[in-house]
């Protein structure tokens, strides 16, 4: 976001109308970006910072699709949802294959490069979007936040998004937060990018971030 602010004139960006959008790990990063302030996570240099500093990483809208919000809690979440471990293992074989030779037992630990079961309380706070929400956000300074999650997600339990919604609603109010749970949508479900859902997303951005050109499922690049 620092870099986007720095090149705003070159590309015609309006720094007062930034929305940040992420799915899964990107959803986590979107929330932590929108909830942190310019004094946090500022140790990583970006191109042009010496010439253009100070610039802000502030965003006006956060779009979080099924992001993980609390490391080390997913096993408890799935137990609460009564989803057997073998079912989750079968559903996430594609992820397990990716970490097979890394030395980590689960995707969370691989992503953090540390066994999440050994995280200290300070480390949990440092990595948790919920911590930065409680620390930094108020009704006056909070971005608008859209949270979408599927109730058939076997990679990130939807209870993570429910807790995020509950915390945000308490701290910044219902006017700033919109949460939708999609029935029978799995992790990274293609249905989220149907023309109907993209139309709803466009309406949300038009309402909260300013006019957005039409986009459809065929024009979205997903990494």
Feature annotation, model-predicted:
Residues 2-79:
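Primarily recognizes the serine-hydrolase "nucleophile elbow" in alpha/beta-hydrolase
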Residues 8, 37-41, 82, 124, ...:
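Active-site catalytic pocket residues across diverse enzymes, especially alpha/beta-hydrolases
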Residues 43, 76-137:
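Mobile cap/lid helix-loop segments that gate and shape the active-site cleft of serine hydrolases
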Residues 55-60, 136-145:
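Short, proline-enriched alpha-helix->beta-strand connector loops that line the catalytic pocket
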Residues 143-151, 155-223:
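C-terminal catalytic histidine-bearing segment of alpha/beta-hydrolase fold enzymes
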